[in-house]
Amino acid sequence: MSATIISGNFIASKLREELKQRIRILSETWMQPGLAVILAGDNPASSVYVRNKARTCGELGIHSKVFNFSADTPQKIILRQIQDLNANPEIHGILVQLPLPSHIQMNEVIAAIAIEKDVDGFHPCNVGALATGHALFRPCTPFGVMKMLAEYGIPLQGQHAVVVGRSNIVGKPMALMLLEQGATVTICTSQTRELASHTRSADIIVMATGKANLLTSDMIRTGATVIDVGINRLADGQLCGDVEFSGVKEKAGYITPVPGGVGPMTITMLMNNTIEAAEHAKAKAQIEARCGSMQ
């Protein structure tokens, strides 16, 4: 048995064609969607991620602008930039590339973003709203995973899902989204004792630990769906996920590859959230215009 490969590249390409149509409508009837990215420090991986996001914006027709800050930039300067972007009507989404330099308080910076422009879904209000099923924007990586599961018709209602990872970016929101769809969710970490005893009972496993090849074929049941969010670089320069792909794919029912799995979906859902933010802004502007004309 060999697993069906869940291609993030394929699903992302399909979704991006739909996004282009929404962007075209916005651009023709109102204005071009705009995304601002704040990059602080000189983390090479962050620079690559930001370039990829800016390139995707250009390919789809979203206006983007990157604001680069040196690693020693005071936090107040970054907060001032966010305030300016909050007030800029041509910017509909604001993204702060993580991680930030150690002297900057991430929570304070994220909380400074206007909720209606929080396209990463990390603002405390959006995080709280996600717990009640009413988030304005959903965090992009778990949102992308949910789209992948839906595209391949993988059932969630009543299924046992194990999420390995507890980050605010992936693990926690992933668990909430699976719960929302009726799954029974177990949350583990890379330090969970007897991790295999949990993963072997799972219908769906989401790996998000940053530990290369942590999940092996003896840790899953036959036919399980395995989603690999991890991306790690080995000593020889090769990329791999948190899943030992070659072995696990012979036992799983569905599996995502690394690269070409979850990664393309994360960026695509960021684009989706930016477009939604622009659509919300357009609707608000139209309502305000109608109200103004009635006075």
From Swiss-Prot:
Role: Catalyzes the oxidation of 5,10-methylenetetrahydrofolate to 5,10-methenyltetrahydrofolate and then the hydrolysis of 5,10-methenyltetrahydrofolate to 10-formyltetrahydrofolate.
UniProt protein name: Bifunctional protein FolD
Subunit structure, as described in the record: Homodimer.
UniProt GO BP: L-histidine biosynthetic process; methionine biosynthetic process; purine nucleotide biosynthetic process; tetrahydrofolate interconversion
Keyword Magnesium: no
Gene3D superfamilies: Leucine Dehydrogenase, chain A, domain 1, NAD(P)-binding Rossmann-like Domain
Keywords, comma-separated and alphabetical: Amino-acid biosynthesis, Histidine biosynthesis, Hydrolase, Methionine biosynthesis, Multifunctional enzyme, NADP, One-carbon metabolism, Oxidoreductase, Purine biosynthesis
EC code(s) of this entry: 1.5.1.5, 3.5.4.9
Chain positions recorded as NADP(+) binding sites: G165, R166, S167, S190, I231
UniProt-listed CDD domains: NAD_bind_m-THF_DH_Cyclohyd
Recorded GO MF terms: methenyltetrahydrofolate cyclohydrolase activity; methylenetetrahydrofolate dehydrogenase (NADP+) activity
Catalytic activity: (6R)-5,10-methylene-5,6,7,8-tetrahydrofolate + NADP(+) = (6R)-5,10-methenyltetrahydrofolate + NADPH; (6R)-5,10-methenyltetrahydrofolate + H2O = (6R)-10-formyltetrahydrofolate + H(+)
The protein's annotated pathway: One-carbon metabolism; tetrahydrofolate interconversion
NCBIfam families (UniProt xref): PRK10792.1 (NF008058), PRK14186.1 (NF010783), PRK14189.1 (NF010786)
Pfam families, alphabetized: THF_DHG_CYH, THF_DHG_CYH_C
Stated family: Belongs to the tetrahydrofolate dehydrogenase/cyclohydrolase family.
This protein's GO CC annotations: cytosol
Keyword Membrane among record annotations: no
